[in-house]
Amino acid sequence: MKFLVLGAGKMGYAVAYDLIRGAKVEKVVVADSNTDNLKELVKRLPDEKIIPVELDVTNEEELAQLMAEIDVAVSCITYKHNYELAKIALATKTHFVDLGGNEEIVAKEFMLDELAKEQGVTIIPDLGLAPGLVSLLAVSAAE
């Protein structure tokens, strides 16, 4: 599988770190507008599966071209872009996951559900720290 990680900061690094260990992962394209972040990520994750790309996510045409070659895109950038990213994912038939962070944006993403189903695309918004990890830790503490 081919993945696109949007954002080469701490969260993007963590996602890329986990992805390159997957046996079925062919490549992990990591895109960021900050070349210093990309250089640091490549330095810390020297793996042939990692492909750094300088990209501004607001350049929708360039982003769509990149997404069209990918199976799954993971947004590790600010929530402000997630709704537009989800729409581009639908247009390119790319599965999409984001870390969430804003209920209004997530609600807008949920409104794309029917279209996503029709196109056979999975969109999973708000898969960040809470409710994900926080819920698991709460269950663990309760047990």
Feature locations, PLM:
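Aromatic pocket-lining residues of Rossmann-like dinucleotide-binding sites
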Residues: 19
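Rossmann-fold NAD(P)-binding glycine/threonine-rich loop
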Residues: 100-123
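Conserved N-terminal Rossmann-fold NAD(P)-binding element of oxidoreductases
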Residues: 3-7
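Rossmann-like NAD(P)H-binding beta-loop-alpha module
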Residues: 119, 124-143
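Short beta-strand element of Class I
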Residues: 27-29
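Conserved Rossmann-fold cofactor-binding substructure of NAD(P)-dependent oxidoreductases
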Residues: 54-72, 81
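N-terminal Rossmann-fold NAD(P) dinucleotide-binding loop
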Residues: 12-13
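Helix N-cap at the beta1-alpha1 junction of Rossmann-like dinucleotide-binding domains, i.e.
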Residues: 33-37
